[in-house]
Amino acid sequence: MNILSRIFARTPSLRTRVVVATAIGAAIPVLIVGTVVWVGITNDRKERLDRKLDEAAGFAIPFVPRGLDEIPRSPNDQDAIITVRRGNLVKSNFDITLPKLTNDYADTYLRGVRYRVRTVEIPAPEPTSIAVGATYDATVAETNNLHRRVLLICGFAIAAAAVFAWLLAAFAVRPFKQLAQQTRSVDAGGEAPRVEVHGATEAVEIAEAMRGMLQRIWNEQNRTKEALASARDFAAVSSHELRTPLTAMRTNLEVLATLDLADDQRKEVLGDVIRTQSRIEATLSALERLAQGELSTSDDHVPVDITELLDRAAHDATRSYPELKVSLVPSPTCIIVGLPAGLRLAVDNAVANAVKHGGATRVQLSAVSSRAGVEIAVDDNGSGVPEDERQVVFERFSRGSTASHSGSGLGLALVAQQAQLHGGTASLETSPLGGARLLLRISAPS
């Protein structure tokens, strides 16, 4: 009982459904045709019996004028019963006398046997009635035999349709089985999932939908891995880079707590604590921005007006550094698809590096657009960067020989990250103003 309940509880397979649907679809016309043939056979056998009775009656009518005793047995139909009535006289060629029925054809029962009777009236020379009858036994036997053949043919047709559907369904469901096997083989490995199915249009559409879904899952999984790696990197780097300034802060605080310092010494120690705290805050802020940049996706990219972005950066830099002269080289409107906040961060960091580490008093911003993309240049008149250090300074926590010790070492790393996120590069050159030129190249979308 449990096995049957499990069998019926399971949803039929697609192959089984195709077979059942085909069998039902084939059974409907087969049953209609079979019913028509069935009724046709029944009527045809009955009509044949009626013609048999007509032949027997036509054979007997010529003998009626000779007398009732002259009526012979039918040579072609030995089992036909012929009964003749003339007045009160009744004559039959068998020991069975057929009853007098209405003209034409009629059914009757004699001795428990069903008979088909054909009655013919002869008006002259004397009113005479001839009744010719035969049993249904042979007709019923022949009809049943033909009916059995019809049933066998119909059953064979339905079974053949089901078998044919079963064979065709094997080819129809093959793409779906391949899809199921490929889907089962998908795991969290190092390669992107591939679902390739050829065959039925429906299977191809499902495969495309599955491929898209798996790709989205894969992308989200990669983003999760990247986020986890970024979090681990953030924790490791933070621990490494913050340990030294935190130790210095602790030492200074212990000095303030344990020693009775003069006012000028006390102010100097407090200044060191404040500077160390600012350095820690700047480092944490830069690390946070690096982590945010690593988690950005192509969905975050929007149209950006580079000319307007540089104009705002120039105005803000003037307010942040009152002694700095910032100029913007006029250029046509340049719009690209990118990360507005990230590009602004890169420009701001380039300006801040020029002021803090290069001692620049003048900064010039410019942008040039071409088919290859956009090139943003930040020129300054500061001390510049030695040629052998122009690649190293883009690494995290790397400082040039001319850099001050107050920075986090992440400013140019943020610039390089933004260049990479936009499919471009970041580099340092010698500026026409005498200092350094930072070039941020952004590739055009393909």
UniProtKB/Swiss-Prot annotation:
EC number: 2.7.13.3
Subcellular localization(s) per the UniProt record: Cell membrane
Enzyme class: transferase
Keywords in alphabetical order: ATP-binding, Cell membrane, Kinase, Membrane, Nucleotide-binding, Phosphoprotein, Transferase, Transmembrane, Transmembrane helix, Two-component regulatory system
Entry comment on modification after translation: Autophosphorylated.
Stored Pfam families: HAMP, HATPase_c, HisKA
Domain of life: Bacteria
Reaction equations catalysed: ATP + protein L-histidine = ADP + protein N-phospho-L-histidine
Residue stretches spanning the membrane: 19-39, 151-171
Membrane topology, record value: Multi-pass membrane protein
Residue stretches making up the Histidine kinase domain: 237-446
Entry-linked InterPro entries: HAMP_dom, HATPase_C_sf, His_kinase_dom, HisK_dim/P_dom, HisK_dim/P_sf, Sig_transdc_His_kin-like_C, TCS_sensor_his_kinase
Gene Ontology CC terms: plasma membrane
Gene Ontology molecular-function annotations: ATP binding; phosphorelay sensor kinase activity
Entry keyword annotation includes Disulfide bond: no
Limits of the HAMP domain: 172-222
Modified sites of kind Phosphohistidine: 240
Function of the protein: Member of the two-component regulatory system PrrB/PrrA that is involved specifically in early intracellular multiplication of Mycobacterium and is essential for its viability. Functions as a sensor protein kinase which is autophosphorylated at a histidine residue and transfers its phosphate group to the conserved aspartic acid residue in the regulatory domain of PrrA. In turn, PrrA binds to the upstream promoter regions of target genes including itself to positively regulate their expression.
PANTHER family documented for this protein: SENSOR HISTIDINE KINASE TRCS, SENSOR HISTIDINE KINASE YKOH
Protein's name in the database: Sensor-type histidine kinase PrrB
UniProt gene name: prrB
